[in-house]
């Protein structure tokens, strides 16, 4: 019969092994899917920013455990003061004309992430967005929960959307934003391998919440502005007609320059750090 002696060294080794096993189990539960928006059925436009802090924390734990997670671009490391206004469009278009007129008034460009069914319903608006120099990204064809899709289903969503977009403006997209802000490794890897950059945001107006006043939105957004920031708004945001002009005027007054996502992203070889910041690789 073999006799095992529990020395201090053995106990430490066993404890480390147990800790790694527990951490792996926790990560499997916490990090497998990142769901960051409320149910679309209850909100006119979802809020994908609710748990960004938890996502980053989970990502750092995954790196520690050797289970590194993929991240989209939340912001860009820039020495200049370029920032990007992004507008998700999936419901209605009654405020889109106001948004475009406001952007024209201040001579700035934005990036619109459209859903395929929205683009099909409002092709003239899509044409105007493109004609006025704004960038258009892929927000999927049907606004599904991407974490629940297979790689092929993800690719089908991307292709169906771009087929719709191309039929309207003769162009396909190179940027992608996930519905509900949801993503996992498979979503990001599949989308990037298909030739898109995955774009999130570091500043959320949360303008889909009807109870948020324009003042509340501005007081939340403006102090967070920094070079390379990506702002999330919605084309049908409740208070967008009240807050957007002030947001733009204030940012311009602070020396910021609004550009499209394509102009904001860095050229050359880049990395995305644990906070989702795109940086030069060297």
Language-model-detected regions and their locations in the chain:
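Residue-level detector of anion-binding/catalytic polar loops
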Residues: 109, 135, 197, 204, ...
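Alpha-helical scaffold elements lining the catalytic groove of polysaccharide deacetylases
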Residues: 93-98, 144-171, 182-227, 240-243
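Short low-complexity, flexible loop/linker segments enriched in glycine and/or proline
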Residues: 126-128, 152-154, 214-216, 272-277
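Active-site-proximal beta-strand/loop segments in catalytic clefts of secreted hydrolases
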Residues: 87-89, 113-117, 140-141, 177-181, ...
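N-terminal pre-catalytic segment of deacetylase/amide-hydrolase enzymes
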Residues: 2-86, 92-105, 216, 248-250, ...
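Catalytic grooves of carbohydrate-active enzymes
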Residues: 225-262
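Active-site beta->alpha N-cap acidic-glycine motif
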Residues: 55-149, 153, 157-164, 171-173, ...
């Amino acid at each position: 019969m073999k006799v095992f002696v529990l020395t201090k060294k053995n106990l430490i080794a066993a404890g480390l092994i147990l800790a790694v096993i527990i951490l792996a189990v926790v990560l499997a539960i916490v990090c497998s899917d990142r769901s960051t928006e409320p149910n679309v059925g209850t909100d006119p436009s979802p809020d994908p920013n609710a748990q960004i802090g938890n996502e980053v924390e989970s990502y750092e734990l995954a790196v520690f455990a050797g289970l590194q997670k993929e991240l989209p671009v939340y912001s860009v490391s820039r020495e200049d003061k370029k920032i990007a206004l992004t507008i998700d469009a999936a419901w209605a278009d009654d405020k889109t004309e106001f948004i475009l007129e406001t952007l024209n008034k201040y001579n700035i460009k934005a990036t619109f992430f459209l859903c395929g069914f929205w683009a099909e319903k409002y092709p003239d608006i899509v044409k105007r967005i493109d004609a006025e120099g704004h960038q258009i990204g892929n927000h999927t064809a049907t606004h599904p929960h991407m974490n629940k899709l297979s790689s092929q289903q993800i690719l089908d969503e991307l292709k169906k959307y771009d087929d719709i977009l191309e039929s309207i403006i003769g162009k396909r997209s190179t940027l992608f934003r996930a519905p509900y802000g949801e993503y996992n490794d498979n979503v990001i890897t599949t989308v990037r391998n298909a030739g898109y950059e995955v774009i999130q945001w570091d500043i959320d107006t949360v303008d889909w919440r009807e109870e948020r006043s324009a003042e509340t939105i501005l007081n939340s957004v403006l102090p967070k502005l920094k070079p390379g920031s990506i702002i999330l708004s919605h084309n049908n945001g409740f208070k967008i007609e009240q807050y957007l002009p002030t947001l733009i005027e204030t940012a311009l007054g602070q020396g910021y320059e609004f550009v499209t996502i394509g102009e904001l992203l860095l050229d050359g070889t880049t990395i995305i750090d644990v906070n989702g910041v795109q940086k030069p690789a060297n």
